[in-house]
């Protein structure tokens, strides 16, 4: 039987299904489809023309089986190789009550039979604006059974009437719908999944036509939970050798869908009759193998896509060995630090003083020693003399530092087992070097740590980094909204999980506007009264109808002069993977109309024991203030 099944887009191989409207002999058809290389079959569970009557006699009591026996296939085949399809005559949102009632009963009958068979997924059409009753019937079905099927909503990328050739150009058309053109089908989907309360079991099967909408519409779809892409054979062109191919625009869309690991469903008859039907599938395989290779960041992040992690608290907690190990593997970060220290040493020590002027360097938060090694390499590269202090509060990491010193560094490095804020330094430093930044710059309390340590920096001393800025951007992602919603803990407030940030490799999301700077900190901080509390207001113009689920956070830092590190997408340091972005969720999704502005307020607050963020949306509508008094999330000092 087929090598793989529904839900298994494993490795680089394309997972694909064949869509058929009529299957006279199910076992034979399944065998033939598997032979062509497909992994599953989409087919009606009942005969598509067999309309059942649920209210009127005598048809209501018609004898005989309603559909064919489940014994035609093994349980395993039903479970893995068949995706059910709803009969095309079922219209639960019909304005005619008799049709509506009959459709409801027939739909439940088909869904229940699909659950009885244990189908992995069921395809349901979304092909009009009003799908409210469809949503109700499906939601009730999901909440009553113990089945685990996924429900794939078949949504066209462009509404069928937008492709009509019979509309006279520039003539007024009768528009009854609120949204026209490219917006339409996304609004059908958005309203439907909102009615279904963002159920994790409802996903998109996106039907791709010959005409593609504009890029921003496609971008928005890619923030949705797309599980399948339906490709009609009619959209394929023919190359010189008679094989089916896709246009360049379609190829670009396929590449982006492959990144989301969607499964492809081929529908329609063979339009390239001299070629085997499997040539459509072979072309998709060809595209998969010839897509741009993943970069170093994507390779490192594999498996972490949209996986929520709690931000580290290295001040309050001692990190584990593996955590240090991951950070030390970053090839870019430490070469940038080395370059910054190198430039700083050259600026501070003129050539004629290179043998007499010994610069005192203090690595604050030395961890297992990567910055100490970067400093030693920089001194060698600059041909300047340095004296090093490696200060680390984690007693476990100090063991590693002391071994380094014993085996490699010698008397050039002094290892100090102490919190930098409490250490009484024997002398003042020319340069302090630290790597205390989190995904949102200051969220691992770099400002508080460095402010507490700057009393042992000389008046003309330098801090590396010298400055850092956090950035925020509004995003839409039902995947991430659902992931956050699922983080509910039984002893906490039911919405506490929406009042804390998460470190996450953003993947299945749509950024609604470019990131804007939020908070900036500079070191050394020479203000007479140091206050690291902050408040900012950011306004983001939005050019599409969409829904806001939260904010992505990034940072940029100036290590020294023109040497920088960044995880802001526009300026991301190539190949650097030490930091994933941070996510600040909001409790309730907010619908945003094209042309509106999203206004967010962000606070950085603190008391003597902890630091926390608070945030609120104030336009286009007001949200609650999230995390007041740090009730759900704080960072311990």
Curated annotation (Swiss-Prot):
GO BP: circadian regulation of gene expression; DNA-templated transcription termination; endothelial cell activation; Golgi ribbon formation; peptidyl-arginine methylation; regulation of DNA-templated transcription; spliceosomal snRNP assembly
Reactions catalysed: L-arginyl-[protein] + 2 S-adenosyl-L-methionine = N(omega),N(omega)'-dimethyl-L-arginyl-[protein] + 2 S-adenosyl-L-homocysteine + 2 H(+)
Record region (Dimerization): 488-494
Origin: domain of life: Eukaryota
Primary site of residence: cytoplasm
Domain SAM-dependent MTase PRMT-type as annotated: residue spans: 308-615
Annotated GO MF terms: E-box binding; histone arginine N-methyltransferase activity; histone H4R3 methyltransferase activity; methyl-CpG binding; protein-arginine N-methyltransferase activity; protein-arginine omega-N symmetric methyltransferase activity; transcription corepressor activity
Class of enzymatic activity (EC top level): transferase
Region (Beta barrel): 465-637
Binding-site residues, S-adenosyl-L-methionine: 324, 333-334, 392, 419-420
Activity control summary: Activity is increased by EGF, HGF, FGF1 or FGF2 treatments, and slightly decreased by NGF treatment.
Pfam families: PRMT5, PRMT5_C, PRMT5_TIM
Annotated GO CC locations: cytosol; Golgi apparatus; methylosome; nucleus
PROSITE patterns associated with the record: SAM_MT_PRMT
Subunit-level organization: Forms, at least, homodimers and homotetramers. Component of the methylosome complex, composed of PRMT5, WDR77 and CLNS1A. Found in a complex composed of PRMT5, WDR77 and RIOK1. RIOK1 and CLNS1A associate with PRMT5 in a mutually exclusive fashion, which allows the recruitment of distinct methylation substrates, such as nucleolin/NCL and Sm proteins, respectively. Interacts with PRDM1. Identified in a complex composed of methylosome and PRMT1 and ERH. Interacts with EGFR; methylates EGFR and stimulates EGFR-mediated ERK activation. Interacts with HOXA9. Interacts with SRGAP2.
Family indicated by similarity: Belongs to the class I-like SAM-binding methyltransferase superfamily. Protein arginine N-methyltransferase family.
Protein name (database record): Protein arginine N-methyltransferase 5
Species per Swiss-Prot/TrEMBL record: Bos taurus
């Amino acid at each position: 039987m087929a090598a793989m099944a529904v839900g298994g887009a494993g490795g680089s191989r394309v997972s694909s299904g064949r869509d058929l409207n009529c299957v006279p002999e199910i076992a034979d058809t399944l065998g033939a489809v598997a032979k062509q290389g497909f992994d599953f079959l989409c087919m009606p569970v009942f005969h598509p023309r067999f309309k059942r009557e649920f209210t009127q006699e005598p048809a209501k009591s018609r004898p005989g089986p309603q559909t064919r026996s489940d014994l035609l296939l093994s349980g395993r085949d039903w479970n893995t190789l068949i995706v059910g399809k709803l009969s095309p005559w079922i219209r639960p949102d019909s304005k005619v009550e008799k049709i509506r009632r009959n459709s409801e009963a027939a739909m439940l009958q088909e869904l229940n039979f699909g659950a009885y068979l244990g189908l992995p997924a069921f395809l349901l059409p979304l092909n009009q604006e009003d799908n409210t009753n469809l949503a109700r019937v499906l939601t009730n079905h999901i909440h009553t059974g113990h089945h685990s099927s996924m429900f794939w909503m078949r949504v066209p990328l462009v509404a069928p009437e937008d492709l009509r050739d019979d509309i006279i150009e520039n003539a007024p058309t009768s528009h009854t719908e609120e949204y026209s053109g490219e917006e339409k089908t996304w609004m059908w989907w958005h309203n439907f999944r909102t009615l279904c309360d963002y159920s994790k079991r409802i996903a998109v099967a996106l039907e791709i036509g010959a005409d593609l909408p504009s890029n921003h519409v496609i971008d928005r779809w890619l923030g949705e939970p797309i599980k399948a892409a339906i490709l009609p054979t009619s959209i394929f062109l023919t190359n010189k050798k008679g094989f089916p191919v896709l246009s360049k625009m379609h190829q670009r869309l396929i590449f982006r869908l492959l990144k989301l690991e969607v499964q492809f469903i081929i529908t329609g008859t063979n339009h390239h009759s001299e070629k085997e039907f499997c040539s459509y599938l072979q072309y998709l395989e060809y595209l998969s193998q010839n897509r741009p290779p993943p970069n170093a960041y994507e390779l490192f992040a594999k498996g972490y896509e949209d996986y929520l992690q709690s931000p580290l608290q290295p001040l309050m907690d001692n990190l584990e060995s593996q955590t240090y190990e991951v950070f030390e593997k970053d090839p870019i970060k430490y070469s940038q630090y080395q370059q910054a220290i190198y430039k700083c040493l050259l600026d501070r020590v003129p050539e004629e003083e290179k043998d007499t002027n010994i610069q005192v360097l203090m690595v604050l938060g030395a961890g297992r020693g990567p910055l100490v090694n970067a400093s030693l390499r920089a001194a060698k590269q600059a041909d300047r003399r340095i004296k090093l202090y490696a200060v680390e509060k984690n007693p476990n990491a100090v063991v590693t530092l002391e071994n380094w010193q014993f085996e490699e560094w010698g008397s050039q490095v002094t290892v100090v087992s102490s919190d930098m804020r409490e250490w009484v330094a024997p002398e003042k430093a020319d340069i302090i070097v630290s790597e205390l930044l989190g995904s949102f710059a200051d969220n691992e309390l770099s400002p508080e740590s460095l402010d507490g340590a700057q009393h042992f920096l000389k008046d003309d001393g330098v801090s590396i980094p010298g400055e850092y800025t956090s950035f925020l951007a509004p995003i839409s992602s039902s995947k991430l909204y659902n992931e956050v919603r699922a983080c509910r803990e039984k002893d906490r407030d039911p919405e506490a999980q929406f009042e804390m940030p998460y470190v996450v490799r953003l993947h299945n999301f749509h950024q609604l506007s470019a990131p804007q700077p939020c908070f900036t900190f500079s070191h050394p901080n020479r203000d007479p009264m140091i206050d690291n509390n902050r408040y900012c207001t950011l306004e983001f113009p939005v050019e599409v109808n969409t829904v806001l689920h939260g904010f992505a956070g990034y940072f940029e830092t100036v290590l020294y002069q023109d040497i920088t590190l960044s995880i802001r997408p526009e300026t991301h340091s190539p190949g650097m993977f030490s930091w994933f972005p941070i996510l600040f969720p909001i409790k309730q999704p907010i619908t945003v109309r094209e042309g509106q502005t999203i206004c967010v307020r962000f606070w950085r607050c603190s008391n003597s024991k902890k630091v926390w963020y608070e945030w609120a949306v104030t336009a286009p509508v007001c949200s609650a203030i999230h995390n007041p008094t740090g009730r759900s999330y704080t960072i311990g000092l």
